């Protein structure tokens, strides 16, 4: 799952486009649609048992097809296999034994029951944007959730019930047709459920909370194949709000939604030599107090214009777009010499689409993250130095998600660990050739090491952006032992072990 990857690596064409259109799609807001979401669904994958489900004498697959005769299962000889297997990060080349596309929760139950008794790995895939490939496990039976992507808005339009395979852009599009939104990232192709349940850092977090804060209920298929409705103050619901798919397949979630007809959003770009001064002034502004509805990110990249730093600005409250939002926008522009300002009234759907279009195609990507308590001279020296040493073999970017509002507030109803103001640095390096991966790794790791050496780091805070071989205990903080107890109760045999921030059963 990937949230803001390469946002600023592709900012030049986005800025150029926005200067012409100013996100004018606001004038074409969809008419109010029904409470169900037929237009905002995945296209059903064609399936022919004769072509797609050849088991080639494999006893495990034979048992699976015998147990679930109507299951859409795609083995390695299927003409659709590679299109289903492929993920966002092209460096992930693992080949599952078979990929299943369930069309009902009952089929998910049957897959889990059957596979857990066969002694072979079980994988679960949402959108396929996890850059570490935890939805594409070698020799596994993989549950591909993408056809379980129903959406239904409640009658009072305060919550939406979504299937576990829903993507961010489809959720945003459906809610946008009702002038609503919820916490989301910028990568429209990312699976919303996994993004949200492991934390859900995103550009609206300070206004509406993290992804985990907006899950109000869930339907989970546990390792035994049973369906559990997690709601209220249940321990399982608390655990999956931060521990995600460690406890089972999240087949459905109930999600809190918010009125959001229009937003004010865009990029503010400053001259590269002013970078440190601008961000230190921004930190002083944050320290003095800013409203939750001022949502900010900062980003660094090298493009056709050379090195650049920009602030992403979003004001998501339509009722206060005007004098109040303009006051804060002018404060941001006054942090330095504003050389580009693309801020305009738009919709979150349009703004997400303008960014997501640049980060949808698969790439060879190396990704790291580290969080800091605030911008300091030492951390900025490391960030600026890393930018000035970006290797020629890689397209590098750093996105800084700034948490100061609701996203940073304590929430005892979730297991997400880091509840304090901080800045999460998402570090990415894309290489045209896979053979240059070592160059990307060296650059990204050097930056992480440099930030840690300043003493300003608070370590890793987001398991979705953490390498699989790293210990996630620090991300969960004081919730670690409680999470282990839940894991031991619902998945004692560690069936769901190929996940973000793995929580051991023992």
UniProtKB/Swiss-Prot annotation:
The keyword Oxidoreductase applies. Induction: Expression is regulated by the aurofusarin biosynthesis cluster-specific transcription factor aurR1/GIP2. Its cofactor is FAD. One of its GO terms (cellular component) is extracellular region. Pfam families: BBE (PF08031), FAD_binding_4 (PF01565). It is found in: Secreted; Secreted, Extracellular space. Residues 92-260 form the FAD-binding PCMH-type domain. Keywords: FAD, Flavoprotein, Oxidoreductase, Secreted. This is FAD-linked oxidoreductase aurO. It comes from Gibberella zeae (strain ATCC MYA-4620 / CBS 123657 / FGSC 9075 / NRRL 31084 / PH-1). The gene is aurO.
